[in-house]
A protein has these predicted regions:
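Hydrophobic packing positions in regular secondary-structure scaffolds
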Residues: 15-283
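Alpha-helical transmembrane segments and their membrane-interface boundaries
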Residues: 272-351
Length: 351
């Protein structure tokens, strides 16, 4: 399976390089129509990865990235933007006009906007906030007030709620009316005076009779999390219950938002990376490993390297001096593997 995964990654990398070179040649010849057609046939995540290559390639002029981004269909531009890393996003924001930035912010999902804001310097944040409408600014500020590692900090307020008195037909009409601007319509939440009272899926409504009441087909035993719940625990709930989204409530059981599956996966990836860093005795970093300077990597490891080098030197001296003791008391040999492990620790720190 490892060989298969490696082969898939290599194939993807080769395809990515071929696409990069193709678009680069079209860009040099100013064949913008052909580039647009290529973008239209690609998934948003693949387009973002391609544009990321242009940002990372030092031989490509930086002004060409905003030019390529402007060739995207406006319907997918915000989705592509959300997939990019924070450095590329900041570069594009600085290149955007106020009107262009407003269009992107209007089309972004709220949780993506908050994620971007959390990675940006104050002057860029000010531009983003200024570009948002009053209601979006209010929702952004609501999410930003929650602690960094809480459920509230990773939730979105863009969910579909229903009244228990709706019929299935009325519910479908409501979903059609508001669904396009919501994060998801797969899971629907029933509220009464803002309090969460039930949950059901879109499939439940589609397969029900038109006159069936929502309160008759909803599930009233709803699993939810508090706004201040640790986000790592929230992510574990998705693994346990196979949720696509999870409702977030305040202390009075009033529904304030949902955490979606993609945000839970981001948390799991972040926590896994942090755990691996701790296993190697390296301070976890929010920055990309490959974009962190050699000096920063060295600074994070130098203290442990010095300690391990000194302990390895001391261990070697002790072993050489007391070789006769090892011969006289063989049980001491069992400690050699532990002592020699410092060499492996040095290797993991250096790599």
């Amino acid at each position: 399976s490892t060989i298969i995964c490696t082969a898939v990654l290599i194939t993807a990398a080769v395809r990515g390089n071929i696409m990069f070179n193709t678009v680069l040649e079209l860009l040099k010849s100013r064949n913008y129509k052909a580039i647009r057609e290529i973008f239209m046939d690609m998934n948003e995540a693949d387009v973002a990865a391609l544009l990321q290559q242009f940002y990372d390639d030092h031989e490509v002029e930086k002004y060409e990235l905003p030019l390529l981004f402007r060739l995207l269909n406006k319907d997918v531009a915000a989705d592509v933007f959300a997939y990019m890393d924070s450095d590329t996003q900041m570069m594009l924001i600085n290149a955007f006009t106020d009107k262009e930035l407003q269009e992107i912010v209007d089309d972004l999902y709220l949780d993506d906007t908050v994620d971007i804001i959390e990675e940006m310097p104050a002057n860029v944040v000010a531009r983003i906030i200024k570009s948002a409408d009053a209601e979006t600014r209010k929702q952004i500020n609501q999410i930003l007030k929650y602690p960094k590692d809480s459920a509230g900090s990773i939730m979105t307020t863009e969910y579909v709620y229903l009244h228990r008195s709706y019929t299935a037909k009325e519910a479908l009409d409501w979903i059609r009316h508001v669904g396009m601007v919501k994060e998801t319509v797969n899971t629907l939440y029933v509220t009464e005076n803002r309090k969460l009272v039930g949950v059901l899926s879109l499939l439940d409504i589609v397969t029900a009779d038109d006159n069936d009441k929502i309160e008759d087909i909803m599930e009233d035993n709803v699993i939810s999390v508090d706004t201040l719940e640790d986000k790592e625990y929230v992510a574990s709930m998705f693994s346990k219950y196979d949720f696509l989204s999870l409702p977030v409530v305040d202390r009075e059981n009033r529904m304030v938002g949902i955490v979606t599956f993609d945000d839970a996966m981001d948390v799991i990836e972040e926590e896994t990376t942090e755990d691996f860093s701790k296993m190697a005795a390296v301070a976890p970093s929010d920055d990309s490993y490959f974009k962190t300077s050699v000096f920063t990597h060295a600074k994070n490891r130098i203290a442990w390297l010095l300690i391990l080098m000194l302990s390895a030197t001391l261990t070697g001296a002790i072993v050489n001096k007391y070789q006769s003791a090892f011969a006289a008391v063989p049980v001491l040999v069992s400690f050699l593997s532990m002592l020699s492990g410092t060499g492996g620790n040095c290797g993991s720190q250096t790599s």
